[in-house]
Amino acid sequence: MKVAILGQRGGWHTESLRGALARRGLAAECYSVTQLTARVTGRPRLSAATAPLDDCDVVFVRAIPMGSLEQVIYRMDALRMLEHDGVRVVNSALAIEHGVDKYYTSARLHDAGLPTPRTIVCERFEEALAAYEELGGDVVVKPLFGSEGKGIVRITDGDTAYRVFRALELGRSIYCLQEFVPHGRADIRAFVVGGRVIGAMLRRAQGWKTNASQGAKGEPLEPDERLIDLSLRAARVVGAEHAGVDILPRDDGEYSVIEVNTIPGWRALRAATGVDAARCLVDHVLEEVGWSG
């Protein structure tokens, strides 16, 4: 059994995966996706830092860095070719693409009947101002691609909307506006692996951003049946084998599914709940591929 990890060498998540694999008697080398070299003819068809990857049984994807359009497309194509050659890529290229795209995820969640905030995406300044008004004059503006709460701003007045939208226009950005959902400065992260919720935490923050990377503090949460159902359905919508599903407990007692993270972090979950997500993920994948070591 040959396993590799695409991620940050020495990073916490990478090392936790390597530790979980070692407990099963497997070693895994770690490479950055920026080290990928693909060959249309000859072998290896795909390598990283000269090491072949197309003879791997499993490749765990822990990071796809930001880059130019060409770089991102090439990296995702490389993952697809690995899958085409029979390598188990976790998560799949398609799931990663779906999860990173906030518009696509929101649209799929809505179409699947899951509760998710009203969202409007557009390219023109005038349409963005109209969307701000349509969504009630209290919105969260997000980058279409992003994570950890970076680049997200809340806008509650027209003057600020005008200035922010003009700045985004200069940067030739897409406008992604989502209605603000009152949530008591807390949200829920449910972690899904292999069709089950292995753990959940409530994240409390000083402000409206509830990402652990933005300083929110996690505490263990026993998910109810409704929360489990929403989390599993959300992960299925994007085709994720494992996912961190972010859900807002609304002030009216209902839930809103915000995002489905398909390269999810689990460090805060481990600290809050003691759940070893890396071990759960490794055990699930090895069972799926028939490894009994």
Q: What residue ranges belong to the model's regions?
A:
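Extreme N-terminal starter segment of soluble prokaryotic enzymes
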Residues: M1-A4
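Structural detector of well-ordered beta-strand residues that form the stable sheet scaffold
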Residues: V89-V90, P117, V140, C176-Q178, ...
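Conserved N-proximal alpha/beta basic substrate-recognition cap immediately N-terminal to
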Residues: Q8-R118
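Short, hinge-like loop/turn segments at secondary-structure boundaries
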Residues: A22, L46-A49, A107-L109, L135-G136, ...
